[in-house]
Amino acid sequence: MVDDKVGIKEYLGIKINYSNERNLDKFSLDTLKDRYLWENETHAQEAFARASVYGATYKGVTDFELAQRLYHYSSSCWFMFSTPILSNGGTSRGLPISCFLNYVPDSRGGLSNHFDENIWLASSGGGIGGFWGDVRSNGISTAHGSKSTGSIPFMHVVDSQMLAFNQGVTRRGSYAAYMDISHPEIEEFINIRKESGGDINRKCLNLHNGINLTNEFLQAVEDDAEWRLIDPKTHEAVKVVNARDLWWQMINARAETGEPYMINIDRCNAALPKEQKALGLEIKQSNLCSEITLATNEERTAVCCLSSVNLEYFDEWSENPVFIDDLITMLDNVIQHYI
């Protein structure tokens, strides 16, 4: 059977060039066809066109000149849409958002709501970064007279959720848990991805983990000083450790597992826009990949959408005066679609 989809054709209001399939290797084409194409799409160029038209549409009005440029950029491998935009943009499946950052409250209702939110976010194609630093630590009294089991067993629930909920074959559920360096469970948290040592029911082998460092802690490491682990519920010191020993625990875990992520939360909040500070907002964690810092709280789940430029073609796209501006407009439009 002869493929009539060759050369330049009209598609979704713009011109696409099926010959640009050769810009992708076999593995790339096979992956796109297996996971990214929508309904009657048969070629990567059609997916690029769909995402381009979607990214060029603002409040129902499409800028087809922008769509044509976005298609040219993507089909020329100057940049690539994120997985949620390329797989979900312009379709009725999933969301175009790459990352969600949410907050875990210190209550049974809050934990239940967090689990429920994770189900919907993971099955819509987004990666999640959750902040656990305000959940009371192991052994602290609860309002019902019992003793808390701490945050780790509840993280283990999320660990199972990420295996169970995903967006079909396109994107598996993925989650990064963040905790403050002063939390009493920090030593156990550092090692939750290690298969050996400790209770298997308090391991999270399918999660990523990140730690919020502070200027005060880093100074304590430099000074080889003591470091207090403070329960977020009682605000009392539960344990005192050596800061440098804790630092080396993190370094050893990173050598063995590649994680935990480490971010300086003080530096992040120092850079928070003054308009958000005036609203009492605060950065509590980063996202799944430790690349985005946005304010979160119990009422505020942050979102971000992404795309990536290809430095292999820097000499080509760096000469284009509207390339970066077009990508920013595209991402703004994607956020507007989500809203």
Language model regions located:
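Extended catalytic cores of very large enzyme megasubunits
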Residues: 1-339
